[in-house]
Each structure stands twice: as structure tokens, then as C-alpha cells.
């Protein structure tokens, strides 16, 4: 049988690192075994579906290049399929209508808890012939779960799991509003889509015995299951779809690249010898479910940043360039054609852990400087500074060959002419063209920012000083 895995998120919030890891493991397992990877969107609970969640899921998977072979399938488009199977189950006597009111079920649950019993349905309607009954009284449809025996399966991570059918009640498979329930839709989809292996979080493990019983009642193939441990935040709490901090969209917006996200997600509960860095091909070749551990993993921001920093320094320049401009386009960041952004990337990106940090540090390459916001701007309002800036403007304006060598020559000439230190002239130029006291090599900044922008910023700075103080201090 051909291997088929699936990733089936519910669009009820943000796709976080737990979902990314599940998708990655399922994708890797399929790729390693020459199988298929299916994307399915479980959107039957319309009251919980969040706007843009589907788009965020698709965007995140595409960004990570976790390409799917089939889908995306939407459960909301398959409602009639589920209802027809429920009708079949009613006719076969493996499902039944339950007319118990919410009030009765609440009282039943309350009494069971008071008597220290496990809350479960008492099967009041199980053996009543309500199939042909026509009534205005609301009802749900329940699956006739076996009342004897055990449900046994071998989890690929946790080993043999066994649970008595006495612990399980008759699962609701259709709500009173006519909508099939999550647990039922999942079973039908896994059956009809020929899913062979299901990798998902351990929070689904309690659903597995019920789903196996449903599949058995339909004479369907029982997939193999692997339930991964939870991923926790820094407070050791389960990741939430409502928390944007750990969402894939947040990491993308902060400038994390696919290789780093995948490499970090891979090792949240998985390890192979002492190796930390894996290419995508290595992941596909090495990945094995037996290397997944049972203990929960904790998001480590420093480690995540380390991975991103590593890849920003080690991927090819062309790929780095592609990712960078994709990030800039998404954030409406554009550079003048005179700015040598390739040089900026080559020389300075490696110092940073994310594109966001990088772009904020060197914002003066694409943003105009608000001179009035420069701290202690009045300190530069001196005649000597004005004279130096006019001298620099004249010299650089005449420069035809814009390269580092000639830029340094003009700076040295200015130092000798005005009898000042390199530090003094460098600070002045930095303030004028970047608005900051600290930058990398000033000659590199001048070179990369380009002649046009460099001269314009000197001109604007001089104009600002003249407008704000016509009598320059000595």
C-alpha cells in the first residue's frame, strides 16, 4: 500500500510551531517513503473558524516549501458525504438518534461526578427504534461504540496502547443542527483519502480509540498512529493558536528564513546523534519516527535565533538575496537604485540574526532621515562643522569614480585640511547621512548609500541647520 500522510489543521487561529512540526514530520515521512502528503482543512465548526486563518496556513506552508500532493481539501465542502455515511450507519444499526435533552445530560453528568464516576452517556436511547421517528424534538446522532472488549493499537512513538470499551461512551457524530462532528469527519476523510500514517500531537491521543472503533464499524483500513509530545512556551504552557508570538506568521514577519524554521522545528522533540544542522535532503533521508522522544519540548528563542543566524551566514548569496527582497516586498520596503544593497547584504547581514533586526539597523539605506529627531542636534550646529560639510559636498560632487579607495582619499584629505581626527569627521558624517553615532565602516556606508543620496543628505542637513539657526556658533 502506498504511504499517505496528511496535515489537517483547523482554521481556528494562528498556525504555530506545533502545527509546523506536525506538518514537517508528516511531509518528511511521506517523502522518505516515496509517498503522498495531503493537506486537509478541518473547517466544519464555523463558529470557531477565524478570518484569514486558512490563508495564513497556506502561506506558511508555501513559505516553508512544504508542498502538498493533494488538496487542500475542505471538510465544509464534504458535508453531504458525511451525512450519507451517517444515514448508512443508521440503516445498518451502528448509529442511532438520541433525543436526550441538554438538561437531562447536564444532570446525568453532575450526578456521575458527585458519585465519583466517569462522566459518560448512559445509552438511554441506544436500543430504541428512533430511526423512522418523525418529531420536532431536537436530536443528535450517536455512534454505537462496542460495550465489550479492548481497543488496542501500537503507537509508533509510545508503543502499545490499550483501553477498555467500557471507558468510552457513544460518541455524537452529528449535532442537533445537522452538522457532522469533528471526530466523525476525520475518520471518514482518513478512510476515503486512504491515509496510512497519522502523525499528530498527543492532545489527540484520547480521540484515537473512538476513531479506530468508527473505522472498524465501517470495515475501513486502520492507519498507523504516532502521537508527538507537546511543545511548550517559555512558561511551560501549551502553545496556543491565540498567541501570535509563536505563530509561523510572526516568525516570517520577523525575518526568519525557511531553512532555519524547518531545522528548528525538526529538533523540537527529535534528535539524530549529535548533529544539529540538516539540509532538506538530509532531513528526508535521515528522518525516522523512532528518533522522536516522548518528553515535551520548550521553545528556546536564543536557539531559534542561532539557527537563523547560522543560515543567514551559510546559504548562497543568491538565496539570501531572494529571501531578503521577498521580506522587503512584504513589508513595503524599497531601495533607490543608487543604493548598493548587494554590498550591504554581503558585508553586514551576517552580523544579524533576522532580517527584521538587519533592516531596522540599516534603515537609513531606504528611509529618509528625520533630522529634527537626531539626539542633541544642536551640538553639530557649529561653524566648523558647516565648513567641513561644505568641503565634503564639493569634493564628493566632483568625484566621478565612486569607489572605496577614492572615498577614503577624500576623507583623509579632509582630515589633513581641517587638522581633525578620523573619529571626529567619522562621527559628523555618520550623523549627517545615517542619523546615528554608531555604524559600520564610514567609508563603506558612504560607498553603499551612493553618491546621489550621500550628497542630498549633506545638503538637507546644511539646510536644516541654516533654517534653525542663521548665526552659527563658533
UniProtKB/Swiss-Prot annotation:
Keyword annotations from UniProtKB, A to Z:
Aminoacyl-tRNA synthetase, ATP-binding, Cytoplasm, Ligase, Nucleotide-binding, Protein biosynthesis
One Pfam family of this protein, by short name?
tRNA-synt_1c
Q: Where in the cell is it found?
A: Cytoplasm
Reaction catalysis annotation:
tRNA(Glu) + L-glutamate + ATP = L-glutamyl-tRNA(Glu) + AMP + diphosphate
InterPro entries attached here? aa-tRNA-synth_I_cd-bd, aa-tRNA-synth_I_codon-bd_sub2, aa-tRNA-synth_I_CS, aa_tRNA-synth_I_cd-bd_sf, Glu-tRNA-ligase_bac/mito, Glu/Gln-tRNA-synth, Glu/Gln-tRNA-synth_Ib_cat-dom, GluQ/Sye
Question: What EC number(s) are associated with this protein in UniProt?
Answer: 6.1.1.17
Record motif 'HIGH' region, residues: 9-19
Sequence motif 'KMSKS' region, residues: 238-242
Q: Which domain of life is it from?
A: Bacteria
- Provide GO CC annotations from the record: cytosol
User: Gene3D superfamilies, from UniProt?
Assistant: 1.10.10.350, HUPs
- Residue sites binding ATP per the record: 241
The molecular function terms of the Gene Ontology recorded here are: ATP binding; glutamate-tRNA ligase activity; tRNA binding; zinc ion binding
> Chief location of this protein?
cytoplasm
Q: Name a biological process GO annotation.
A: glutamyl-tRNA aminoacylation
Q: How does it assemble?
A: Monomer.
Function of this protein?
A: Catalyzes the attachment of glutamate to tRNA(Glu) in a two-step reaction: glutamate is first activated by ATP to form Glu-AMP and then transferred to the acceptor end of tRNA(Glu).
Query: Which family does the UniProt entry place this protein in?
Result: Belongs to the class-I aminoacyl-tRNA synthetase family. Glutamate--tRNA ligase type 1 subfamily.
Q: Which PANTHER family match?
A: GLUTAMATE--TRNA LIGASE, GLUTAMATE--TRNA LIGASE, MITOCHONDRIAL-RELATED
HAMAP family documented for this protein: Glu_tRNA_synth_type1
Designated name of the protein: Glutamate--tRNA ligase
Amino acid at each position: 500500500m502506498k504511504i499517505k500522510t496528511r496535515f489537517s489543521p483547523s482554521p481556528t487561529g494562528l498556525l504555530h510551531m506545533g502545527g509546523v512540526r506536525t506538518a514537517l514530520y508528516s511531509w518528511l515521512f511521506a517523502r522518505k517513503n516515496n509517498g503522498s502528503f495531503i493537506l486537509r482543512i478541518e473547517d466544519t465548526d464555523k463558529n470557531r473558524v477565524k478570518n484569514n486563518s486558512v490563508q495564513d496556513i497556506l502561506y506558511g506552508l508555501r513559505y516553508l516549501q512544504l508542498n502538498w500532493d493533494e488538496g487542500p481539501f475542505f471538510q465544509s465542502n464534504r458535508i453531504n458525504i458525511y451525512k450519507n455515511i451517517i444515514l448508512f450507519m443508521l440503516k445498518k444499526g451502528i448509529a442511532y438518534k438520541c433525543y436526550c435533552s441538554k438538561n437531562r445530560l447536564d444532570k446525568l453528568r453532575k450526578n456521575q461526578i458527585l458519585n465519583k464516576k466517569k462522566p459518560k452517556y448512559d445509552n438511554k436511547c441506544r436500543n430504541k427504534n428512533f430511526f423512522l421517528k418523525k418529531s420536532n424534538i431536537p436530536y443528535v446522532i450517536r455512534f454505537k461504540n462496542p460495550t465489550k472488549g479492548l481497543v488496542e493499537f501500537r503507537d509508533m512513538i509510545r508503543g502499545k496502547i490499550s483501553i477498555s470499551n467500557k471507558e468510552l461512551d457513544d460518541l455524537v457524530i452529528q449535532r442537533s443542527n445537522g452538522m457532522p462532528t469533528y471526530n466523525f469527519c476525520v475518520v471518514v476523510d482518513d478512510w476515503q483519502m486512504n491515509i496510512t500514517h497519522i502523525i499528530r500531537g498527543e492532545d489527540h491521543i484520547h480521540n484515537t480509540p473512538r476513531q479506530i472503533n468508527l473505522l472498524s464499524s465501517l470495515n475501513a483500513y486502520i492507519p498507523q498512529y504516532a502521537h508527538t509530545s507537546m511543545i511548550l512556551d517559555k512558561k511551560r504552557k501549551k502553545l496556543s493558536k491565540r498567541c501570535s508570538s509563536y505563530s509561523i506568521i510572526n516568525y516570517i514577519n520577523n525575518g526568519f528564513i525557511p531553512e532555519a524554521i524547518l531545522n528548528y522545528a525538526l529538533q523540537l522533540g527529535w534528535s539524530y546523534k549529535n548533529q544539529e544542522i540538516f539540509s532538506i535532503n538530509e532531513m528526508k533521508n535521515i528522518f525516522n519516527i523512532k528518533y522522536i522522544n516522548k518528553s515535551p519540548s520548550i521553545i528556546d528563542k536564543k536557539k531559534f535565533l542561532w539557527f537563523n543566524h547560522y543560515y543567514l551566514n551559510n546559504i548562497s548569496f543568491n538565496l539570501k538575496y531572494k529571501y531578503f527582497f521577498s521580506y522587503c516586498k512584504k513589508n513595503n520596503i524599497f531601495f533607490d537604485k543608487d543604493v548598493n544593497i548587494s554590498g550591504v547584504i554581503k558585508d553586514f547581514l551576517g552580523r544579524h540574526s533576522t532580517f527584521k533586526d538587519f533592516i531596522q539597523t540599516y534603515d537609513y539605506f531606504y528611509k529618509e532621515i528625520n533630522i529634527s529627531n537626531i539626539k542633541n542636534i544642536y551640538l553639530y550646529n557649529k561653524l566648523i562643522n558647516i565648513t567641513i560639510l561644505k568641503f565634503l559636498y564639493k569634493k564628493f560632487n566632483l568625484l566621478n569614480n565612486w569607489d572605496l579607495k577614492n572615498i577614503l582619499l577624500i576623507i583623509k584629505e579632509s582630515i589633513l585640511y581641517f587638522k581633525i581626527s578620523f573619529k571626529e569627521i567619522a562621527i559628523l558624517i555618520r550623523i549627517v547621512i545615517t542619523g546615528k553615532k554608531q555604524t559600520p565602516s564610514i567609508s563603506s556606508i558612504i560607498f553603499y548609500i551612493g553618491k546621489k543620496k550621500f550628497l542630498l543628505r549633506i545638503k538637507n542637513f546644511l539646510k536644516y541647520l541654516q533654517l534653525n539657526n542663521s548665526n552659527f556658533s563658533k
